[in-house]
């Protein structure tokens, strides 16, 4: 997918802007569970902001390491519903220079962290529509532009991409087998696994449509939005109703 670049995107180019020189797909995800181009965009977005950083969903902790490295003098708050960090990532995050500023929280991401504001928000937790919507409602209004910099929110698995194209192109037998099995299933499975989460995409689209955000940049499945305003009071209801209407229209 082509990268979306907003008018106020960072003009100076760094190594993170040269991800197009590399083969970037699901084969190079590693501990961070992101493509190289996605991780490069995450790094760039963090650098375009200031203030505290909030991460929803850290899994092995690879993305938390990237956030800590990209924002060496900033506080990082990472929320997950379990502690599942890779040992190498955990060792990095508990170094003396990181221990006091990186908070590895095990708590409910659908509840706001009291009395905290953030310059950057990264959401990669519950990918269901309901989960992403709840995370956005809980934390969006705590996202604030700081020191003249942008307030940005990054969403992983948010837009269609080619991350799994290499794998699915030659899986003809798998697709035929899935097609046959679907004849006997009450709930159909896709012949080609989705390369993004429709629930994440829907919430991001609603943020833009309701005027709360504009699209900043994207790479692979990663979408970065620029915050424009706080959420309308009834954003959750309006978004849920809009999604239900879209489903009914597609039947």
Protein language model features and the residues they cover:
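S-adenosylmethionine/decaboxylated-SAM
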Residues: 8, 12-251
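N-terminal auxiliary segments of SAM/dcSAM-dependent transferases
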Residues: 1-6
């Amino acid at each position: 997918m082509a990268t979306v670049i907003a008018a106020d995107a960072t003009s100076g180019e760094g190594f993170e802007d040269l991800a197009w020189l590399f083969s970037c797909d699901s084969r190079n995800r590693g501990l961070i569970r992101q493509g190289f181009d996605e991780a490069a965009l995450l790094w760039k977005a963090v650098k375009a902001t200031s203030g505290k950083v909030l991460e929803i969903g850290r899994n092995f902790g690879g993305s938390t390491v990237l956030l800590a490295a990209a924002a060496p003098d900033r506080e990082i708050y990472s929320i997950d519903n379990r502690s599942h960090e890779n040992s190498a990532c955990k060792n990095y995050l508990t170094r003396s220079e990181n221990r006091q500023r990186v908070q590895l929280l095990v708590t409910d991401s659908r509840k706001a962290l009291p009395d905290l504001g953030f310059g950057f928000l990264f959401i990669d937790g519950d990918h269901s529509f309901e989960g992403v919507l709840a995370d956005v409602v809980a934390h969006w209004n705590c996202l604030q532009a700081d020191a003249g910099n942008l307030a940005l929110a990054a969403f992983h698995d948010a837009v269609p991409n080619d991350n799994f194209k290499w794998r699915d192109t030659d899986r003809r037998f798998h697709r035929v087998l899935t097609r046959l099995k679907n004849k006997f299933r009450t709930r159909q499975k896709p012949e080609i696994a989705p390369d993004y989460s429709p629930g994440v995409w829907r919430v991001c689209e609603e943020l833009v449509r309701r005027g709360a955000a504009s699209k900043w940049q994207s790479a692979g499945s990663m979408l970065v939005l620029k915050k424009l305003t706080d959420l309308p009071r009834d954003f959750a209801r309006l978004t849920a109703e809009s999604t239900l209407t879209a489903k009914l229209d597609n039947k």
